[in-house]
């Protein structure tokens, strides 16, 4: 019995969910999202709740049961409330700014890095070194945050670089004479 898969998904009042041609579609104030239903999983929508359960008790269906439930839950939460990832920049001269449809990053390289902002996301920069990425798709928000972080990941000696706001960097001691 899957502990994650057997949980019921509650649908908020402002979100509309329906199943069409093997896809679960959700519409809400933050936009529209959809996810494919796995072949071994059934998804039922009752009033204001969604239930996922496997068609058969084979190994593969049971493995995808919890995954399918979480994918459906993520689109329901995404179109209702949205997801937010926060990044912090530490380092002398490290700055960020939004210029049109690009995020400009000054990270100590000889050139600025221009990162194109996807249409479905909103990026805000606060005090030139705090970046907030928000959007309906949890996968896209996390992927963009990861790509921005990868330009200059945090280093363990001085803590310079881009890190998630809730991330703890294990610091190392420098070389001793």
Region spans (language model):
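N-terminal intrinsically disordered, cationic/polar leader segments
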Residues: 2-146, 150-164, 168-177
